[in-house]
Amino acid sequence: MQKLLLITGIILCVSISTTAQKSRVISANNLLESENYQEAKEAIDLAVINTKTANWPRTYLVKGLLCQNAFEAGFEKEDEKKTKLYPDQLYLAYDSYEKALELDAKKRIHASVETQYYELANSFQKLGQRHYLRREYNQALKAFELALLVSRSPLISVKVDTSLIYNTAMAAYESRSWDKAVQYLTGLDKDSYSPETSLLLQKAYMAVGDSISGELVLNDGVGKYDYNQTIVLQLVDHYVASGRWEEAFVLMDSAIVHQPDNYYFPWTRGLLYQNLEQYELAIEDLQQASKLAPEEVPIFYNLGICYYNMGVEIDKKALQIRSNKVYRATRAEAKKSFEKAVVWFEKAYEANPGDQPTILKLYQLYSRLDMTEKRDSMKQFIR
């Protein structure tokens, strides 16, 4: 009987001791509800290291609540007394909740964690946005990925907002985390999120040395986004950089058919012809572009360059001609090209009188054509 009383006493003492320790967790919860975060921290930190409560799910639930609630209370005003109770406080909130779920075999607190996860995902998004705006891209990526992780938790299983995936992709891109950038941008590109995602995905592939996949993305984007101008021009640049001129022209021909009112396309094809010194074809396209965009001054300059270069080529041919009659006729032909160049350069100068390349070309042409008065007036503007 005495032995039984002894055992009962021991059990009672253990029970009282355990209850006392658990009351510390309850006290911490009460303190955080009254926004006494520092005192709540002291109480919960003791509970975490006490053997009686170290494996109690509610201990970690309360720690998660403390970390999250204090962080959210201080976030807008950047109150570090609230947001830095612990290092990486919001991440510790998530880890604490996950620990609580792991210990909660009977799932008694799952509903409580579920309630917190909706707001926790939102808090990670806000944290990521703050880091991103401050160009702290690695930290932004970390926060956005946690927002995704929480949003995809089986506890809440909400449909992830594509804007969150986009933000995560952008943080990965800006932080030069290329593999992750490819991962997130690929998902967006499959959903036809925007032309920008195709362009960024192509650049991410190029950054990891996968030019084949990058080219496929742009090719797909041309059709997907109805010959989006930026995608088309990026693909043309890719073809030209790899010496695939024929494919560049095929693409531009198709783009002009699909978007006949887009002056960038004949302008670009004209520049391709100009680069290959096929000046007559270049002039034809550039004039068409100028009709579509009569205020686009750089086209005037490009037309001037074509006529100028044609004149130079004809002049070179004249030097090889022995017949005086043919020589004079060839020089006259060159002069006509130079005079046409003057017309376009003067239009460019009239629209943008401070442009040095235009001023220099006019000075050269006035000199070549013996237009002394105009040459002298232009000389003063050369810097």
State where each predicted segment sits.
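Canonical positions in the second alpha-helix
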Residues: 47, 100, 147, 187-188, ...
